[in-house]
Amino acid sequence: MALNLQDKQAIVAEVNEAAKGALSAVVADSRGVTVEKMTELRKAAREAGVSMRVVRNTLLRRAVEGTEFECLKDTFTGPTLIAFSNEHPGAAARLFKDFAKANKEFEVKGAAFEGKIQDVEFLATLPTYEEAIARLMGTMKEAAAGKLVRTLAALRDKLQEAA
């Protein structure tokens, strides 16, 4: 279906707004993936706080101009599916990585975070806020327990020397 100028401008504005509010973006090629699988991916994306859109490459280039995802322009070739992570920087990358494992036709082209092209594996392995806090607390707890053990050992050594 041919798009008129107003439709194209609306698409560019919509994608631009999504890009401005996003933490990261991932670009993929979904050629060969069945409609049922794409529907599952879209459902999983909604649940993960990821907005996805298939957009013409020329419109996508215009939409990302002036955003931190302008670095992805070189990946806009062939059918392009773009996903913006709104809640966690690694959400879209994790979603696409897992989907690509299950669907060999699905190809992840690239990802961007903080204005730079990033490895999808790197973004997908970023811990969520809750995971990062849990790791920090575990490290702090571990350090406190270690300090207590060293203090008790020093006290024991001091008492043995005195005896």
Swiss-Prot record:
Per the record's keyword annotation, is Ribosomal protein included, yes or no? yes
Q: Which Gene3D superfamilies match?
A: 3.30.70.1730, 6.10.250.2350
Instruction: State the taxonomy lineage.
Output: Bacteria, Pseudomonadati, Pseudomonadota, Gammaproteobacteria, Pasteurellales
The record's listing under HAMAP family reads: Ribosomal_uL10
Q: What is this protein called?
A: Large ribosomal subunit protein uL10
PANTHER family (UniProt xref): 39S RIBOSOMAL PROTEIN L10, MITOCHONDRIAL
Give any Gene Ontology cellular component: large ribosomal subunit
What is stated as this protein's family in its record?
A: Belongs to the universal ribosomal protein uL10 family.
Q: What gene is it encoded by?
A: rplJ
